[in-house]
């Protein structure tokens, strides 16, 4: 469960290390984002040689959350951290690698490229 102001790790090799959520599209009633939601983030810390630069604003998709995600079969899945993958304007990943596991819900939301690059899908 991600809200405005939440700090998140990046799960790709775009160069950003830490980002902050600054917007959740969906109107005034959309207060929280969960796995598979696209949010607006700003880069808070980045490596100097990376594509993503500190202070820039990007779209990102949430791939892991500490808050558990309910599955239709009654099971729950949660991760150790909150993580996102940075996206370009066409909603494609900026990085070429995905680090760590991603949730299976991304496949049903249409992020096939992220699921195929991920080392593990939970």
From Swiss-Prot:
Disulfide-bond pairs as recorded: none
- Key word Repeat present in the record? no
Tell whether Ribosomal protein is among the UniProt keywords.
Answer: yes
Matching SUPFAM superfamilies, A to Z?
Ribosomal protein L14
Supply one GO molecular-function term.
structural constituent of ribosome
Report keywords, A-Z. Answer: Ribonucleoprotein, Ribosomal protein, RNA-binding, rRNA-binding
GO cellular component assignments: cytosolic large ribosomal subunit
Tell me, what is an example of a GO biological process annotation in this record?
A: translation
Q: Which InterPro entries match?
A: Ribosomal_uL14, Ribosomal_uL14_bac-type, Ribosomal_uL14_sf
Q: In UniProt terms, what function does this protein have? A: Binds to 23S rRNA. Forms part of two intersubunit bridges in the 70S ribosome.
The UniProt similarity line reads: Belongs to the universal ribosomal protein uL14 family.
**Known partners and oligomeric status:** Part of the 50S ribosomal subunit. Forms a cluster with proteins L3 and L19. In the 70S ribosome, L14 and L19 interact and together make contacts with the 16S rRNA in bridges B5 and B8.
PANTHER family in the record: 50S/60S RIBOSOMAL PROTEIN L14/L23, LARGE RIBOSOMAL SUBUNIT PROTEIN UL14M
This protein's name:
Large ribosomal subunit protein uL14
Top-level taxonomy: Bacteria, Pseudomonadati, Aquificota, Aquificia, Aquificales
* Gene behind the chain: rplN
